[in-house]
Amino acid sequence: DFAPSFSIWTTIEECLNPPLMWEDGRGWYTTEPFSDLEVFDFPEGIGPVECVNVEHEEVVLIPQKIDAKKVAFKYGLGAQFITTLKTIHMLGMDRKDTVDVQGVAVSPRDLLAAALPDPATLGSRMKGKTCAGTLVKGLDKEGKPRAVYMYNVVDNAWSMANYGDQAVVWQTAINPVIAMELIHKG
C-alpha cells in the first residue's frame, strides 16, 4: 500500500520538483527528480535503502554558512515509493490545476490527498525505524580522505509510546523544539 507519512502535497513538492543542488564554482542548479540514485546502508538495523536527490531548503542554507564543495539533499525512499511517485506524475495526479469532473472543478492533487489515508492517523500502523543524518566527506588534518555520518534513528514504537507521534513527525519536530529551548535559556 502507498501511504506517505507526510502530507501528499509536501511529498509531491519535495520529491517531484527538480532538486536543487550546489557545487563550489558552479553555484546552485537543479537536476531531474529522483536523480543520483544510490543505495545507502543505514545504521541500527535499517539496512540498505534506495536514496535519491529531493528538493529541500538545506541545500540553500548550508553553502551560505559552511565552506563546502558540494551540497545535496537525499531521501531514502525505496524503489516501490519512487515507482509510485513516478506513476502519480505520469498520470498527472500531481497537478495543482483543476480538471472538470462531471461539472465539478477538481485538482488531481486534492483528489489524491482525499483518497490517501491521513498521515496523522498512520502512526499506530507504522512499523520500524527512521533515520535522519548528514554524511560529510572531505580530508582530515593529514590530508587523507575521511567520511563521517552523523545521524539520529527513531523507532516508531518508541515515539508512539512516549509522545503519541509517529517517528517521522517526531524526528522532524525535535530539532526546532531543542533550538527553541536553547534560545529560551540563552
Where are these regions (language model features)?
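C-terminal catalytic/substrate-binding lobe primarily of soluble NAD(P)-dependent oxidoreductases
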Residues: 1-186
